[in-house]
Structure formats: C-alpha cells, structure tokens
Design a protein with these regions (language model features):
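Phosphate/ribose-phosphate-bearing ligand recognition and processing surfaces
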Residues: 84-176
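Glycine-/small-residue-enriched capping loops at alpha/beta junctions
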Residues: 1-111
C-alpha cells in the first residue's frame, strides 16, 4: 500500500474519533490544560486525570500512553511540544517537535495500534506557526511510515479548514 493511502486529513473534533489512538498535546507536568488537552480530559473522564497525576511528568519530545477511558479511541498517547521561540533555538525546537511525533508513533507500533490521529501539536498555546509545525509533522510521519513494518493509518485531525487543506495538499504531493 502506498504511503498516501495511509494518510488522511480531516477537520474534526479529535475526541469524537473512534480509532485505536488519539494523540494529546500535553504539558510536561501532565496537569489539566486547555485546548486539545482540556477537550480530551473532559471527554475521557476523571480516570485519565488520575492516571496522568500518578505519571507526574513527561519531558518535551517524549510520549506516554494511557487508556482512552470514556473516549471512543482505545488509547491516548500524550506528548509534550517545546514552546516556540524561533531564532537561534529553532533547529533544536524543530528536532524536539519531530521527536513528539516519532515517539508517539513508536508507542503506537509497540502497542499494535493501527489507526492514530494527531492534532496540530504545539500550534495552540505553545505558539508554533502552523506551516512550520505541519511540515515537521508530515515529514516525520511519512518517514516513519516508510521505515515501519506496521501498516498503520495516520489521520491529521485539524481544528481549522486551512490546516486540513495544508495537510491534504502535502498528501496529494506524496501521491504524485
């Protein structure tokens, strides 16, 4: 199966997706936040909050997995992006954001997850420019799919139409 057939871009509420796993853009102390994190926690229920409180910490670029609890998704993979600063910090930050995607996909492979959805990690409160973050996300995901023996499908779940269209264009370019 070609790579493009294993990718999709949707404009949707990630908490409504009935797939194997969704990815959460968490903070390093795994404390309740707003945006995607707040929506996921609200829908998953108190059990998710309790589990993340016990876990206590996740470093930037790392990822951890929990059950989805009351979500339609079986699992939630939590990852922490760096806060965008740009300038001389940009290369290191880009590598860390790429690790968010790579480590989430690694956990997905290790847990036999075949369908996974990513939000636009880092583009909310962490202020990543959406075009920069999308390119990093897309390139990291495509690279992983090319190397992995696991035949998974990745959904880029976007809040805004413009973001969905950006991912759709990148998918079309891979399709040729």
């Amino acid at each position: 199966m070609d790579i493009a057939a294993r990718l999709e871009a949707v404009e949707a509420d990630i908490t409504t997706l009935a797939i194997d796993a969704i990815v959460n853009a968490a903070n390093s102390h795994l404390m309740p936040g707003g945006g995607v994190d707040g929506a996921i926690r609200k829908r998953a229920g108190r059990e998710l909050d309790d589990e993340l409180r016990r876990a206590g910490f996740c470093a930037e670029g790392d990822a951890l997995i929990t059950p989805g609890y009351r979500l339609p998704a079986a699992y939630v993979i939590h990852t922490v992006a760096p806060v965008w600063a740009g300038g001389k910090e940009r290369p290191a930050q880009e590598q860390t954001l790429a690790r968010c995607y790579a480590n989430a996909l690694k956990l997905a492979d290790e847990n036999n997850i075949r369908t996974i959805a990513f939000p636009s990690i880092g583009t909310g409160a962490y202020r990543w420019p959406t075009d920069v973050a999308a390119k990093i996300a897309f390139d990291t995901v495509v690279g992983h799919l090319k190397r992995s023996d696991v035949q998974s499908t990745v959904t880029f779940c976007c809040f805004a139409r413009a973001d969905r269209e950006r991912y759709a264009a990148m998918i079309a370019a891979v399709r040729g």
